[in-house]
Amino acid sequence: MPSYRTFSFGLAALFLSACAPLHQKTYLPNDPGIAWQERQAQLRQLTSWHIIGRASIAQDKKAWNAGVNWYENAGVYRIKMMGPFSQGGFHLDGTPEQVILTLSDGQTTSSSSPEALLNKTFNLNLPITALRDWLKGLPYAGDAPYENIEIDNHGRLKYLEQLRWKIYYQQYKRYGQQQLPSKLFMSHPELKVRLVVDNWKYEQ
C-alpha cells in the first residue's frame, strides 16, 4: 500500500508539471514586443557607423543607380553617391549646423538642410535626415510620429509609414552583434528608392 509521503510527492510533481506550461507562456523570452523594445534601445546607441551599398532611385520616367558610402560619427556625417547619378555623383558633408554639397566637378553649395540641397540641385526629395534612423531599422526620432509600423517575429522593423514614406524592410543580415537591414524598398508619392547594403561597420 503506498505511503502518505509517496502520495504527497506524486501530487506535488503532478501540480508542478501542470503549472510549467503556464509559467513558460507567461514569461516568453522571445516575445517580439519585448525584443523590439530592447532592440530600439541598442540601435539608438549606434552613433558611429559606416555602410557600403547601392541605390536605385526612380522619379517620374527617370531613374538613377549609384554606389553609396555613408559615414556617421556622433551627428557628423559624409554621404558619397557615386556612379551615373545625374551630374556624375556628389557627396554631402553634414553637421548639426550646416550641410555642404559637393558635385563631381568640385562645385559646392551649402544649407542647413540636406533635403533642401538635394531638392534644389537635383529636384529630388530624399529624406536624408530620417534615413539616418531608417537605415538602422528604426523609426525617425525627430518630430514626426509614424502612421503605421509592423514588427516581425524577431522584434525587427518590418514595415514603417512615416513622413509620407512607406519603408519595407526586405532582408536583415548579422553584422557583429546586431542584425541590421541589408535590403530596403522605400515608396513615396513622388519617388521610389531601393537600397542594398553590402556591408555594415559600426563601433560597439
Please state what every model-predicted region is:
Residues 39-60:
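A short, Trp-centered hydrophobic/proline-enriched beta-strand micro-motif
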Residues 52, 64-66, 71, 76, ...:
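Beta-strand-dominated lipid-handling architectures at cellular/organellar boundaries
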Residues 59-63, 84-89, 189-192:
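Solvent-exposed loop/turn segments connecting transmembrane beta-strands
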Residues 20-23:
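Bacterial signal peptide processing site
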Residues 15-18:
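C-terminal motif of bacterial Sec signal peptides marking the signal peptidase cleavage site
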Residues 76-125:
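An acidic-aromatic
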